[in-house]
């Protein structure tokens, strides 16, 4: 290869390398390659940074010093933690959530804000009852309600404390003096008060309606807790203890007559063809629906089907299974383009049919009980619903009314908690009318009282709230807030904050009649978990009482949470906050995406890819990962699948990385609402970053120790306790020294960039900025210059810039930065002022020197030269004084020649100079 082609190749490589440094994703990809995916798990060498030794001591000291309690003086900044469920331990998704929140809180605290970061946990009604029930079943224990609640509280105490320990290990700077649990007495009072107030406003009411029934959990669930699974034609699903076919549409004949009192042989009647995906519900049909524009049911069409009947005569269907005579009704609900254009109406087991029944005054006939067994008298009684389906189809075949069975794409509603196929049933429940509250919540975003980030999320907000339905509050569970409603012997319900409160209301209506407190029976149901969670921003501060905390810290400032619960939780907090307090609960909503595994799969215990963040912090063997998974509530089939995933993804276990590396890795991924494919092994790259910080600290400490020893009472000296005192002269003024001016300019640029990105919640940009500054500018360049020169001015600048780097890193890496800071100063870095730009214009020509340096490095590395000879003809902004820095930064240079004329020969122009790099002979 000739020299010009070689030079072109090298220039392209340099440009590519520079581009990589400016783009985070490419940088992270490079780091992933450095880590590798099949290296065995390694422990730290004794001389390296050991996160466990450092991280283990600091949280207790922070708490003892009360550093996370709000300190008056600055503007208030309040962040409520989305309370984790007490169903188990925190997972990596929680770790990302608290890493984001804590980075914001620590940053704001250092900027002088009065920060309150509120911790707590959620009782998680359905989820906790489910895991406790599984545990009891596995142990063969049968309990009543009181016994179950005792077991559930034991579970909460065990796992709630585990969650708080995990939060501490992650360095979360919450004020544990204000921690709350959603079933605490104070929270329970708030829930009862909210229910009563909403009831008295006419927003809560009790009514029989179609609900989503889960027969495995034996409770209703909300629309948001239903997953709508699209299945292809003729798909078999495991449900109700067997495998059943879905994705099928059945056509059958419905006998019709003009005789309302028909009681003869229905098989001799004319028929119309009906299509359904649920033939088992024919047992509950109370009407047949056709479209009024369907010409088949015009007077002429009816005459053609039924013969000579009086004009305007009503026609009826005869249920092919029960022989009940039911009306044929006309409604636009019947879609003439779908199926046969004729729809059977089963109001008790279909939400749309239920609405049709209300319009036409149809009765509701229940087909299934709460265990999905047929309750209709006759040959099908007692069959489970999908067994009944097969029996019904067989019966229709036998009597000649079956037409066909065709594959058809279908959407199956499944419980997000149990995976059961939801059965719509009618139940009398407590409902919250959300329409007007939703309108107010929309207005709060439209007028700017609440901002939702990242941009674009508002569209989802408007769409969902604009189509909101009433909220079913009742849940058929034992674990949760009992509905504060009490039933009298008359059947009337009385709502009160307490039983005594409800009794007073009942007695006021007794009109002198005898009535007794014991006659009132509290509703057995509990409230939807999201109702109590919806009060979180203000109930945690003492509402409904006007406590000092409530008056001072409400509304909150920032609500940071996952985008997947925008409607489950965030919308309900806004609706309830506006309705009950008259104020928005917070001014900003920040949403993040879902954390998935390295393969892009959603994390699931049954898949074996849910990782406890403590396993990443402390390290974990494959054996422990498997044993921990086996100790859960998975069945044997799920255990086998999960174990296979663990063996594939973590053949050598997980290396010890520390909390700082985990936090930094999670934050470096975070960009808006995009889902994150987290490769746990990539955290190891940031563990090595911690080691780089530690080694830099050891060098800086050596340098400033020497400087302090020389200066006595100089600009950097020690107090009587061995801590450093830095005078106002710590930073030299403008100087002709290239490296000093250059590093101060880069320091200012980095401070400005991190402040900008953190203020806009761009954690990816913030972590990229400090990582690149620390590695490529401070360590790779300035520390190398200081090593060679040991110039006092350089050391003082190094000290200041290094400490500022620790402060910039602190919101992301609280432990190692606190450890480093404590080696130099009294007090905590967490309450030290965040760096600001110094206001000086630091102009430096040193960047040209670095250009030449990088060219020399790239040339030597690309050719595999361990030693090189360099010839430079200085020009442009480079003079002979700059050349000493080039030598100190390029260790591969064994000879550096300064020449005056480089017009001839294979010299390349770099930064105004002519440069030749060649291998030593």
Curated annotation (Swiss-Prot):
A motif ('HIGH' region) lies at residues 84-94. SUPFAM superfamilies: Anticodon-binding domain of a subclass of class I aminoacyl-tRNA synthetases, Nucleotidylyl transferase, ValRS/IleRS/LeuRS editing domain. It catalyses: tRNA(Val) + L-valine + ATP = L-valyl-tRNA(Val) + AMP + diphosphate. ATP binds at residue 605. Keywords: Aminoacyl-tRNA synthetase, ATP-binding, Cytoplasm, Ligase, Nucleotide-binding, Protein biosynthesis. GO terms for biological process: valyl-tRNA aminoacylation. GO terms for cellular component: cytosol. Gene3D superfamilies: HUPs, Isoleucyl-tRNA Synthetase, Domain 1. Its EC number is 6.1.1.9. A motif ('KMSKS' region) lies at residues 602-606. InterPro entries: aa-tRNA-synth_I_CS, aa-tRNA-synth_Ia, Anticodon_Ia_Val, M/V/L/I-tRNA-synth_anticd-bd, Rossmann-like_a/b/a_fold, tRNAsynth_Ia_anticodon-bd, Val/Leu/Ile-tRNA-synth_edit, Valyl-tRNA_ligase. One of its GO terms (molecular function) is aminoacyl-tRNA deacylase activity. Residues 1-20 are annotated as: Disordered. It is found in: Cytoplasm. Pfam families: Anticodon_1, tRNA-synt_1. It comes from the Eukaryota. It is an enzyme of class 6 (ligase). PANTHER family: VALINE--TRNA LIGASE (PTHR11946:SF109), VALYL-TRNA SYNTHETASES (PTHR11946). Belongs to the class-I aminoacyl-tRNA synthetase family. This is Probable valine--tRNA ligase, cytoplasmic.
């Amino acid at each position: 290869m000739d020299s010009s082609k070689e030079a072109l190749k090298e220039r392209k490589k340099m440009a590519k390398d520079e581009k990589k440094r400016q783009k985070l994703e490419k940088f992270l990809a490079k780091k992933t390659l450095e880590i590798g995916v099949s290296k065995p798990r390694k422990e730290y060498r004794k001389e390296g940074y050991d996160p466990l030794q450092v991280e283990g001591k600091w949280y207790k000291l922070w708490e003892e010093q009360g550093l996370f309690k709000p300190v008056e003086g600055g503007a208030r900044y309040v962040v409520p933690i989305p309370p984790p469920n007490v169903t188990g331990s925190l997972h990596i998704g929680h770790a990302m959530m608290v890493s984001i929140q804590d980075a914001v809180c620590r940053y704001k605290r250092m900027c002088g804000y009065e920060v309150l970061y509120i911790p707590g946990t959620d009782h998680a009604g359905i989820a906790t009852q489910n895991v406790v029930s599984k545990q009891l079943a596995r142990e063969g224990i049968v309990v009543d309600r009181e016994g179950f609640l005792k077991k559930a509280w034991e579970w909460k105490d065990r796992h709630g404390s585990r969650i708080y320990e995990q939060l501490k290990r992650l360095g979360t700077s919450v004020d544990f003096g204000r921690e709350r649990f959603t079933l605490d007495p104070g929270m329970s009072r708030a829930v009862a008060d909210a229910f009563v107030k909403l009831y008295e406003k006419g927003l809560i009411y009790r009514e029989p309606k179609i609900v989503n029934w889960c027969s495995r959990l034996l409770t209703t669930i909300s629309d948001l807790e239903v997953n709508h699974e699209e299945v292809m034609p003729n798909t078999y699903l495991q449900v109700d203890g067997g495998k059943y076919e879905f994705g099928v549409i059945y056509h059958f004949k419905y006998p019709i007559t003009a005789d309302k009192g028909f009681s003869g042989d229905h098989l001799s009647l004319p028929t119309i063809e009906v299509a359904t995906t649920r033939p088992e519900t024919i047992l509950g049909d109370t009407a047949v629906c056709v479209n009024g524009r369907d010409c088949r049911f015009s007077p002429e069409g009816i005459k053609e089907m039924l013969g000579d009947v009086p004009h305007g005569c009503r026609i009826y269907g005869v249920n092919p299974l029960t022989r009940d005579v039911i009306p044929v009704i006309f409604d636009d609900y019947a879609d003439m383009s779908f199926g046969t254009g004729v729809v059977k109406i089963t109001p008790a087991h279909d939400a749309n049919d239920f609405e049709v029944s209300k319009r036409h005054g149809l009765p509701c006939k229940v087909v299934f009980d709460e265990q999905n067994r047929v309750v209709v008298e006759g040959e099908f009684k007692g069959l489970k619903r999908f067994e009944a389906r097969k029996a019904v189809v067989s019966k229709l075949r036998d009597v000649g009314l079956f037409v066909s069975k065709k594959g058809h794409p279908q959407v199956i509603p499944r419980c997000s908690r149990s995976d059961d196929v939801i059965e719509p049933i009618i139940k009398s429940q407590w409902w919250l009318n959300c329409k007007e509250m939703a309108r107010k919540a929309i207005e709060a975003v439209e007028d700017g009282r609440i901002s939702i980030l990242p941009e674009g999320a508002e569209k989802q907000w408007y769409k969902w709230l604009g189509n909101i339905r009433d909220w079913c509050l009742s849940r058929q569970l034992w674990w949760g807030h009992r509905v504060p409603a009490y039933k009298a012997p008359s059947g009337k319900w009385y709502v009160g904050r307490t039983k005594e409160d409800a009794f007073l209301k009942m007695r006021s209506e007794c009109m002198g009649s005898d009535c007794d407190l014991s006659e009132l029976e509290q509703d057995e149901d509990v409230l939807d978990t999201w109702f109590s969670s919806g009060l979180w921003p203000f109930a945690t501060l003492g509402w409904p009482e006007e406590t000092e905390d409530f008056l001072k810290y409400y509304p909150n400032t920032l609500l940071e949470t996952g985008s997947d619960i925008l409607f489950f939780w965030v919308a309900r907090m806004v609706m309830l906050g506006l309705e009950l307090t008259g104020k928005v609960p917070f001014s900003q909503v920040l949403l993040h995406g879902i954390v998935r595994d390295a393969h892009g799969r959603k994390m699931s215990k049954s898949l074996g890819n849910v990782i406890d963040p403590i396993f990443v912090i402390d390290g974990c063997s494959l054996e422990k990962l498997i044993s921990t998974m086996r100790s859960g509530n998975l069945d044997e089939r799920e255990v086998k699948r999960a174990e296979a995933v663990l063996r594939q993804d973590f053949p050598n276990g997980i290396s010890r990385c520390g909390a700082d590396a985990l936090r930094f890795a999670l934050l470096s991924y975070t960009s808006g609402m995009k889902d994150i494919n987290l490769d746990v092994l990539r955290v190891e790259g940031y563990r090595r970053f911690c080691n780089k910080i530690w080694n830099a600290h050891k060098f800086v400490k050596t340098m400033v120790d020497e400087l302090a020893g020389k200066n006595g009472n100089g600009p950097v000296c020690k107090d009587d306790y061995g801590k450093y005192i830095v005078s106002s002269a710590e930073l030299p003024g403008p100087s002709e020294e290239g490296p000093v001016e250059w590093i101060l300019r880069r320091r200012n640029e980095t401070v400005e960039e991190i402040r900008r990105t953190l203020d806009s919640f761009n954690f990816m940009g913030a972590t990229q900025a400090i990582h690149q500054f620390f590695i490529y500018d401070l360590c790779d360049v300035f520390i190398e210059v200081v090593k060679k020169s040991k110039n006092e001015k350089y050391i003082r600048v190094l000290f200041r810039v290094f400490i500022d780097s620790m402060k910039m890193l602190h919101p992301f890496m609280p432990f190692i930065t606190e450890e480093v800071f404590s080696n130099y100063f009294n007090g905590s870095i967490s309450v030290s002022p965040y760096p600001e730009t110094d206001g000086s214009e630091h102009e430096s020509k040193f960047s040209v020197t670095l250009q030449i340096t990088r060219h020399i490095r790239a040339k030597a590395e690309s050719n595999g030269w361990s030693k090189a000879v360099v010839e430079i003809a200085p020009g442009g902004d480079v003079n002979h004084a700059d050349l000493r820095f080039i030598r100190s930064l390029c260790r591969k240079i064994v000879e550096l020649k300064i020449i005056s004329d480089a017009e001839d020969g294979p010299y390349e122009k770099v930064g105004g100079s002519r440069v030749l790099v060649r291998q030593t002979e």
